[in-house]
Structures are given as structure tokens and as C-alpha cells.
Design a protein with these regions (language model features):
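Active-site neighborhoods and metal-handling regions in enzymes and metal-associated proteins
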Residues: 1-117
């Protein structure tokens, strides 16, 4: 992540890493921009085609929050209107970080001390 990179490149890397380890990427949910409104554009997909999507510029802030499934990528929303499950009943994991694009790369704003690099 750095100025000039494209959002499709981020999604592609996440997808390749997940699928390369025999997992799938949920396509029903995505990351998002952070600004004056909490969930705003751009949508940040966790799958994609390299060389596509919005160009990153210094000062952009957005989340990456992939949901990675042990089975297939399909999900279903439970009747409570909030809880999401995998369609095939397999395990899933989700995590989120907020990133800021800097002149020299990226700052992970939500990284715990032990995660900083």
C-alpha cells in the first residue's frame, strides 16, 4: 500500500493469499473508506484483478476487513438481521485494520504495539 497503488492490487493479494492456503474470500462484504462519515467510499474489495481500481493517494484512509472461510465463500444472514454465517456451515474468520496512505507507504492505524512493523 503506497501512493500510486491500485485498490484491485490489494484485493488480489488478499485473495491469492487466502486461496493459496485453501480458503475462500467472502464477496458479500468489503472494506470501506474512513473520513467524515464512518462507512464511505471507496469500497475496498478483498478479491480482485491486479492493475484495476481506484488509485491510492497520500492521505486516504480506509479499512481492509476480509472474511476468510474454511469452505466456500457463500454467506447467509440470520433472522436477527445481524449475524452472518457461512452457507456451508464451515468456520470463518474476520479481522479489520484501518490504513492511512502516507507519502512513503502506509501506516496501520489500528495495529497493536506487537503488530507494528
Amino acid at each position: 500500500v503506497k501512493p500510486g497503488a491500485l485498490l484491485g492490487d490489494i484485493g488480489y493479494v488478499i485473495q491469492q493469499h487466502a486461496e493459496g492456503n485453501y480458503y475462500s474470500v467472502v464477496r458479500d462484504y468489503c472494506g470501506h473508506g474512513i473520513g467524515r462519515i464512518f462507512h464511505e467510499d471507496p469500497q475496498v474489495l478483498h478479491y480482485g484483478t491486479p492493475g484495476t481500481g481506484m488509485e491510492l493517494v497520500e492521505g486516504m484512509t480506509f479499512t481492509i476487513e476480509p472474511m476468510i472461510n474454511a469452505g466456500k465463500s457463500g454467506t447467509k444472514l440470520k433472522s436477527d438481521g445481524w449475524t452472518v454465517e457461512t452457507r456451508d456451515g464451515r468456520l470463518s474468520a474476520q479481522w479489520e485494520h484501518t490504513l492511512a496512505v502516507t507519502a512513503t507507504g502506509v501506516e496501520v492505524l489500528t495495529a497493536r504495539y506487537e503488530e507494528r512493523f
